[in-house]
Amino acid sequence: MQVLPQTRVQGVPSGRNLSCSKAVGGTPLRALTRDVVRPARSVNVHVVADGESADDVLLRSSSVAVAEKPKVSGRAFRRSLKDTGRYVAKPINDKDSLDLMEEHGVGYSSVGLVAQMRANNNEWRFKDIRVKLASAYGYCWGVERAVQMAYEAKKKYPDRQIHLTNEIIHNPTVNERMTEMDINIIEQKENGSKDFSKVSRQDVVILPAFGASVQELSLLKDLEVQIVDTTCPWVSKVWTAVDNQARKAHTSVIHGKYSHEETIATASFAETYLIVRDIEEANYVCNYILNGGNKEEFLTKFKNAISKGFDPDRDLARVGLANQTTMLRDETMAIGKLLEKTMIQKHGPAAIKEHFMVMDTICDATQERQDAVYQLVGQQDNPAEKLDLILVVGGFNSSNTSHLQEIPELKNIPSFWVNEAACIDPVNKKITHRTAHGTMLDTQNWLPDGPVTIGVTSGASTPDRAVEEVLEAVFKTRDASFGGIAPNYDLGTAPVVRHEEH
């Protein structure tokens, strides 16, 4: 009879920039532990705490009482920043900054393993390991643009203090580089509000790729700082949709996660909003629209995801759809169709334009990466192309990466989401990884013996270097004498083909 090993389960609070090196190899995190018996592997569980409401975050978005939402529309207010002479919203494509990004491992690979895979039909072989890189992966244009603008700001303002209102993107390596360059995230006070007291008029403040709330923009304008706005244009497109909905007195139904920075910023551009996480919550809302229900139950269910004073009986008569750009495209589209169908049933086809607004705000880059993973997993019936497992590389707090991980999980393909090479322990044949829904696991002997085909993808905030280092850890797991992949400088003579701007 086989003896099942004991499994140690830990409940650990996760925080900003959680990484394998910090959660596993660094200072131990406080935890309550208990021993349970489970088959096959050692499991280390990190419990993710619930976030506070989007409205709470907006209410305490600064420590300055005057930072209230401007009376003009958010879109008009953002345009007004351009008239200050202290607002930059586009990169200048400085070559030195791009070169430094690659040197620091936060740009595109032009000579390393990923570049060599691109030149080899997105494949690589090491001994009996075959690696298949997704056709669309890693840095999207908006993320590269944000990091590039931060590097350009450091070059342009070398003697000025530079602040970030939040992580510039959801990747630990990139955020560590920001800190090394003395570009630091504005600290939070005990109550969670950002402490702008150390920001002075001569300073530079960088807004991250997922944007900032109207309240924060108003505060920064009043402080008369130099603003470098790296907000992804796709996120700005969502804000435009929400602003249009507000001007036409429609409630914005936002498909997203209420605690995500992008959704918090998007909500600040709305007059009235309701955030739904998935199709199940959207079905609940649509059932209420058609049949009514218990208002108190509704308000309790969505207490963290509604604007102040929200009344479902009043505010669901006219709605518009918006989305967090990193959500699953198919689910956003399904929610849109459900809302449209519901409003037609409620108000009739002739009145649909008065009661429902929709604008295509789905990010192409997010969809391309999801489609590429579907393509990877879509050949499991073909023995020559079947994947034995999938590696997903990206920050553990990255929403778009979680949805990439979700795809192989739904297909029952062994998949491991790691955020850096430190998650892989070649000596002990162990991998620390995360599930799409936030559980951290330690898996022993995760890499099968014999010939193995591995699919690889990475989140839109993940630089190529992170993928290269993860794959090198995989190869070292197979062969302890592995010494790395030599750069191919012949590839470096040609310009890097970057992901397309949409």
UniProtKB/Swiss-Prot annotation:
Residues given in the record as [4Fe-4S] cluster binding sites: C140, C232, C363
Entry binding sites for (2E)-4-hydroxy-3-methylbut-2-enyl diphosphate: H170, H260, T325, S398, S399, N400, S461
Swiss-Prot/TrEMBL GO biological process terms: dimethylallyl diphosphate biosynthetic process; isopentenyl diphosphate biosynthetic process, methylerythritol 4-phosphate pathway
Signal peptide: none
Main location: plastid
Keywords: 4Fe-4S, Chloroplast, Iron, Iron-sulfur, Isoprene biosynthesis, Metal-binding, Oxidoreductase, Plastid, Transit peptide
Catalytic activity: dimethylallyl diphosphate + 2 oxidized [2Fe-2S]-[ferredoxin] + H2O = (2E)-4-hydroxy-3-methylbut-2-enyl diphosphate + 2 reduced [2Fe-2S]-[ferredoxin] + 2 H(+); isopentenyl diphosphate + 2 oxidized [2Fe-2S]-[ferredoxin] + H2O = (2E)-4-hydroxy-3-methylbut-2-enyl diphosphate + 2 reduced [2Fe-2S]-[ferredoxin] + 2 H(+)
InterPro entries reported in the protein's UniProt record: LytB/IspH
Entry's localization field: Plastid, Chloroplast stroma
Cofactor note: Binds 1 [4Fe-4S] cluster per subunit.
Pathway in which the depicted protein is active: Isoprenoid biosynthesis; dimethylallyl diphosphate biosynthesis; dimethylallyl diphosphate from (2E)-4-hydroxy-3-methylbutenyl diphosphate: step 1/1; Isoprenoid biosynthesis; isopentenyl diphosphate biosynthesis via DXP pathway; isopentenyl diphosphate from 1-deoxy-D-xylulose 5-phosphate: step 6/6
Enzyme class: oxidoreductase
Family label: Belongs to the IspH family.
Protein name per its UniProtKB record: 4-hydroxy-3-methylbut-2-enyl diphosphate reductase, chloroplastic
Species of origin: Botryococcus braunii (Green alga)
